[in-house]
């Protein structure tokens, strides 16, 4: 527990700082934007790129006998650094540009949401293909009660292929030998396309409500707080799961199927909701169907709570399913 303490202390500080800046802004209409910023940060912890990067780095450092406790935290700090810097720059730039382009706020908000939604759908579909391949291997190993060397190599190839940015920056992992070395990798991940669209949303929110500089700073800080909390918890869970999951090949593939399935679901679910909400709003669509009307009015704050609860249930369900149905294959 002592090894985790400095990281969780830093996370508590980020939460306190973000909330303090938010309350100092003294603008109740800004609370929704702050909730959205926190949820967007938390959402990233469940992105396929984040999961794959943290997973691969922890696996590498653990196999080398090195301390991997700070991987999730330093990765999120690298990613958040881009968001903090660019949100501040973008907010000031947008405030200036809005005087010359009155439609910028509306157009930018729509474009940002569309880009984010489409990107999530693409990532979700790419990882769904990988998930199908993992399930095929698991089915074969389930029937044969073992994994061949070729199947193990195929699993490794699939796991390192999860996430678009993870594929692109894969060579950088060779230079990571300590937890803090993942910070620049996280920074590069922060330059990704989906992050750019979210920066635009945060900047537009602060500019639209005409909040003070203090309030504007609360958005990227809360974004960083949400991301660092769940990325660090992700790393903690993976370190614990590593001891359990990688003792046998079957556990390894089952664990990664569970993780990949969750990342596919969240990418497709949030992407579809983002696109559905912006399209229905612009077309002024009204739905009598209860489900569609609920999705249309669903707040991202509520969505964040639902997703966190869903992940807890899914992880527990996955663990007990293994114990009940598949653990006998290890004997």
From Swiss-Prot:
Belongs to the NiCoT transporter (TC 2.A.52) family. Disulfide bonds: none annotated. The gene is nixA. GO terms for molecular function: nickel cation transmembrane transporter activity. It is a multi-pass membrane protein. InterPro entries: Ni/Co_transpt (IPR004688), Ni/Co_transpt_high_affinity (IPR011541). This is High-affinity nickel-transport protein NixA. It comes from the Bacteria.
């Amino acid at each position: 527990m002592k090894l985790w303490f400095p990281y969780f202390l830093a996370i508590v500080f980020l939460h306190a700082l973000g909330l303090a800046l938010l309350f100092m802004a003294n603008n109740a209409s800004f609370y929704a934007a702050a909730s959205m910023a926190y949820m967007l940060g938390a959402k990233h912890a469940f992105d396929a790129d984040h999961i794959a990067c943290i997973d691969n780095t922890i696996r590498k450092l653990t196999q080398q006998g090195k301390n991997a406790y700070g991987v999730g935290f330093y990765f999120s700090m690298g990613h958040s650094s881009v968001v903090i810097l660019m949100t501040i720059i973008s907010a000031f730039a947008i405030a200036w540009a809005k005087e010359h382009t009155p439609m910028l706020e509306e157009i930018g908000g729509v474009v940002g949401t569309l880009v984010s939604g489409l990107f999530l759908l693409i990532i979700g579909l790419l990882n769904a293909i990988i998930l199908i391949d993992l399930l095929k291997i698991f089915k074969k190993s389930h029937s044969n009660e073992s994994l061949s060397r070729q199947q193990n190599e195929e699993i490794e190839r699939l796991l390192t292929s999860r996430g678009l940015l993870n594929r692109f920056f894969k060579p950088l992992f060779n230079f990571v030998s300590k937890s803090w070395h993942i910070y620049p990798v996280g920074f590069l991940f922060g330059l990704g396309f989906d992050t750019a669209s979210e920066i635009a949303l945060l900047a537009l929110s602060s500019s639209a409500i005409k909040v003070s500089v203090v309030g504007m700073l609360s958005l990227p800080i809360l974004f960083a707080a949400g991301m660092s909390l769940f990325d660090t918890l992700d790393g903690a869970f993976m370190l614990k799961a590593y001891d359990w999951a990688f003792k046998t090949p079957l556990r390894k593939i089952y664990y990664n199927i569970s993780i990949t399935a969750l990342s596919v679901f969240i990418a497709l679910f949030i992407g579809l909701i983002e696109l559905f909400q912006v399209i229905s709003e612009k077309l002024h669509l009204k739905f009598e169907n209860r489900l569609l009307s609920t999705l249309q009015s669903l707040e991202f704050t509520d969505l964040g709570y639902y997703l966190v609860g869903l992940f807890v249930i899914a992880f527990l369900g996955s663990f007990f399913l293994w114990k009940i149905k598949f653990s006998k294959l290890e004997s």
